[in-house]
A protein has these predicted regions:
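Extended, small/polar residue-biased N-terminal targeting/export presequences
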Residues: 50-114, 162-164, 168-192, 401-407, ...
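Cleft-lining beta-strand/loop regions that shape enzyme active-site pockets
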Residues: 27-38, 42-62, 114-118, 122-131, ...
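Short acidic, Pro/Gly- and aromatic-enriched capping/linker segments at domain boundaries
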Residues: 334-345
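Sec/Tat signal peptide C-region and signal peptidase I cleavage site
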Residues: 22-26
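Linear, non-domain "peripheral" regions
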Residues: 3, 20, 179-183
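Conserved functional hotspot residues or short segments at active or partner-binding sites
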Residues: 346-424
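Bacterial N-terminal signal peptides
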Residues: 10-20
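Bacterial N-terminal signal peptides that target proteins for export
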Residues: 1-10
């Protein structure tokens, strides 16, 4: 038994001994939320498991304490989770924009991992995995009953190793198995930057997620578009599962004056834990007309950007209702090399609107059929910013088409207004 576990057990035994001696003194009523009785009960259950469980190798103190910790967090909410040393290291790799896996973004829904998006040219995309697919079994382990982080980690591993997944595809009502080889992935967070219409100066870019490099990637894309006489901009957040709040704040800062509230983190008893404000940046396009494209796979940090620019009337939102993930997880170091990912707050928009469980309703709702949504999600990876690529079975991007129309109308209104002002 390790020294750490011995110390824990010693404390537990001391607490039990002290409580057992209380009847010899004056009666003391325990606090309503006192840990003493619970610790006694837990320790008793621990001993019973150790004495009677059939597979003795499974009930070491180390494994039991880890299982207890996982179970405790699992019952709180879908996002709180314990991260072992291995998992914690992978988390740090992901926030740097690098990871080993198959290149897929997932969310937990109905006991399965629902695919929100796949990285362009990733192993997942090459194997035929599509947005909307429901992953039910990973290397023989059912997803049902697992937390999001726990299930998603099963898709990761070492470079060159394969993972076998069993999935259900709602769009075709089919079940299938896929075996995919893991690779080292470099996450490209800003793609497809281009001028769509030179006459109006309508530009386009897609933010696939908010990673450590997003602000840098965004600045490069914007600088290139500005050189091409950018007058109007469409930012595509469809299929963006979120990421780092700090980089979403940086992205908003490019389109707002400095010191504007972007998002507030509200904790227990409505206490404001932190208020993120827009920053002063080299590239600032606070007067540039914007459209944001969103859908049901736009989540978390992407919803922060959407809600912020909507509240300040800086952008017209077009598409479908967003996902509705508006809770904050803090990664708290636990021990020397482990961590607990714990929900500590809710996101609130600048106008104090809550995102969690509600999502954001676009200003212009354009609902797609499941089949069209499914086809378009895959198409965006290779042909972002194209209304209808010259491909067999290509679908027309009616949401993008509407965005272009809206921005042209905005430009016409501005040009007319400016002309009237000049002639007065």
């Amino acid at each position: 038994m390790t020294r750490k576990i011995k110390n824990v057990l010693l404390v537990l035994l001391c607490m039990i001994f002290v409580q057992g001696s209380l009847p010899l003194q004056a009666e003391i009523k325990p606090e309503a939320d006192s840990p003493t009785a619970g610790i006694q009960k837990f320790f008793h259950a621990l001993q019973l498991i150790r004495q009677h469980y059939v597979d003795q190798e499974k009930v070491t103190y180390k494994s039991l304490f880890e299982l207890a910790l996982r179970g405790l967090l699992k019952e709180l909410d879908p996002y709180s989770v314990y991260e072992s040393e291995e998992v914690f290291n992978k988390t740090k790799e992901e926030t740097r924009g690098e990871k080993v896996g198959i290149g897929v973004f997932v969310i937990l829904r109905l006991g399965s991992l629902e695919v929100l998006a796949t990285d362009p040219e990733s192993p997942a995309e090459k194997a035929g995995l599509k947005p909307g697919d429901m992953i039910r079994i990973i290397d023989g382990e059912p997803v049902n009953g697992k937390k999001l982080e726990e299930a998603a980690r099963l898709l990761q591993g070492n470079v060159g190793e394969s993972v076998t997944i069993q999935l259900y595809r709602p769009s075709t009502d089919k079940h299938m198995d896929l075996t995919i080889e893991r690779q080292k992935l470099r996450i490209r967070s800003v793609t497809g930057a281009k001028i769509l219409d030179r006459a109006s100066g309508t530009g386009y870019l897609r933010i696939t997620q908010f990673s450590q490099h997003t602000a840098e990637d965004l600045d490069k894309a914007l600088a290139d578009l500005i050189k091409q006489d950018l007058q109007l901009l469409i930012i595509d957040l469809r299929g963006n599962p979120g990421g780092l709040v700090s980089t979403a704040v940086q992205a908003c800062s490019r389109f707002l004056p400095p010191e504007k509230t972007v998002v507030s983190l509200i904790g227990r008893k409505e206490k404001i834990l932190k208020c993120f404000v827009s920053e002063k940046c080299k590239i600032n396009l606070q007067d540039l007309p914007l459209v944001l494209l969103v859908n049901g796979s736009t989540a978390s940090a992407a919803e922060i950007m959407t809600a912020c620019l909507r509240d300040y009337k800086r952008a017209v939102i077009i598409g479908e209702q967003t996902f509705g993930k508006g809770v904050v997880q803090n990664l708290i170091p636990f021990g020397k090399k482990e961590a607990i990912r714990l929900t500590t707050a809710h996101y609130y928009s600048p106008s104090r609107q809550i995102i969690q469980g509600k999502g954001i309703t676009p200003d212009i709702v354009i609902t797609l059929t499941p089949a069209r949504r499914f086809a378009l999600a895959g198409q965006l990876n290779h042909h972002p910013g194209e209304i209808q690529p010259q491909l067999r079975n290509a679908v027309r991007d009616v949401q993008l088409e509407r965005a272009i129309e809206v921005l042209k109308a905005v430009k016409l209104f501005r040009d007319t207004h400016n002309f009237e002002q000049q002639t007065k």
